[in-house]
């Protein structure tokens, strides 16, 4: 058995070494894109960083991978990807793009990443993450839509009138939120670690998904005036509310709250419960 494990480990290391060797040494290339864009689509595990110190798009990749890098503008969309049926062969794919105040939509897939210290600002901001992609940025808008799947992660504060969060497949979001309306839909073991203040909170949690417990100054960190919605499949939520809570819980789900909210009209079945806590 030990011999088999040794052989397997050797083969894995050889394969990784071969991939890195095939990718070649890192090289950098500039891409000039004419015209503005409002949408960014990134695929194939590119790591994108926004900078105000550059005026062209700069890509770093293995010298044998670089010919397969595609940076193109289609209409209002900037798309960064590899050519179809090609591979990075173990090469890190890094991109630096100039700061663009007009950017209002970010779409990441295939374990891609987006990093910006400047924030997205507009009337409506859309963020779509799939395939274990990661987003690091603050968002300011009238309306914000975040759609995440496949163990993707979002790290950043959101300030908007309306926020719609839809997470599935063990995705995670973490940040400070300020909104008039916050709609949270979590499924498939997804988690939201949120702090902040919202007027209207709607929760739809299923499949062991959670609004994670976070305590600030002897209360739960996510504050709302009113909360309604459904929770099922062993999901948990922790909120602070001084207004009203009207929820339907099933399948061993639990809603924990601090504050003086009235829970009249709520319904709990299947071992579910609403708990008034004092952290």
Can you say where each PLM-predicted feature lies in the sequence?
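Bacterial Sec-dependent N-terminal signal peptides
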Residues: 1-28
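Calcium-binding motifs, dominated by EF-hand helix-loop-helix domains
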Residues: 106, 127, 146, 165, ...
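Detector for intrinsically disordered, low-structure N-terminal pre-sequences
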Residues: 11, 143-145, 202, 214-215
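Acidic (Asp/Glu) and glycine-rich low-complexity loops/linkers
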Residues: 19-128, 136-147, 155-162, 174-176, ...
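Short, surface-exposed interaction patches in beta-rich subdomains
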Residues: 158-162, 173-279
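Thr-biased low-complexity repeat/linker tracts and other Thr-enriched repetitive architectures
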Residues: 130-132, 149-151, 168-170
């Amino acid at each position: 058995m030990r011999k088999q494990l040794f052989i397997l480990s050797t083969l894995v290391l050889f394969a990784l070494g071969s991939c890195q060797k095939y990718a070649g040494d890192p090289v950098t290339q500039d891409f000039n894109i004419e015209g503005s864009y409002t949408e960014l689509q990134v695929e194939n595990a590119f790591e994108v960083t926004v900078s105000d110190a550059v005026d062209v798009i700069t890509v770093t990749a293995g010298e044998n991978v670089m010919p397969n890098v595609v940076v193109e503008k289609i209409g209002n969309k900037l798309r960064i990807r590899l050519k179809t049926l090609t591979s990075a062969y173990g090469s890190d794919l890094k991109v630096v793009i100039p700061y663009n105040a007009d950017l209002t939509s970010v779409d990441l897939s295939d374990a891609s990443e987006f990093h910006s210290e400047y924030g997205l600002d507009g009337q409506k901001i859309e963020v779509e993450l799939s395939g274990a992609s990661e987003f690091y940025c603050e968002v300011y808008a009238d309306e914000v839509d975040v759609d995440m799947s496949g163990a993707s992660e979002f790290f950043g504060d959101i300030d908007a009138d309306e926020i719609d969060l839809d997470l599935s497949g063990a995705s995670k979001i973490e940040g400070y939120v300020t909104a008039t309306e916050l709609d949270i839909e979590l499924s498939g073991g997804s988690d939201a670690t949120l702090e902040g203040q919202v007027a209207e909170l709607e929760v739809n949690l299923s499949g062991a998904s959670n609004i994670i417990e976070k305590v600030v100054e002897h209360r739960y960190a996510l504050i709302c005036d009113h909360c309604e919605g459904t929770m099922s499949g062993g999901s948990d939520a922790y909120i602070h509310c001084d207004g009203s809570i009207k929820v339907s819980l099933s399948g061993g789900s639990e809603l924990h709250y601090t504050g003086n909210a009235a829970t009249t009209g709520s319904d709990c079945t299947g071992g579910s419960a609403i708990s008034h806590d004092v952290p």
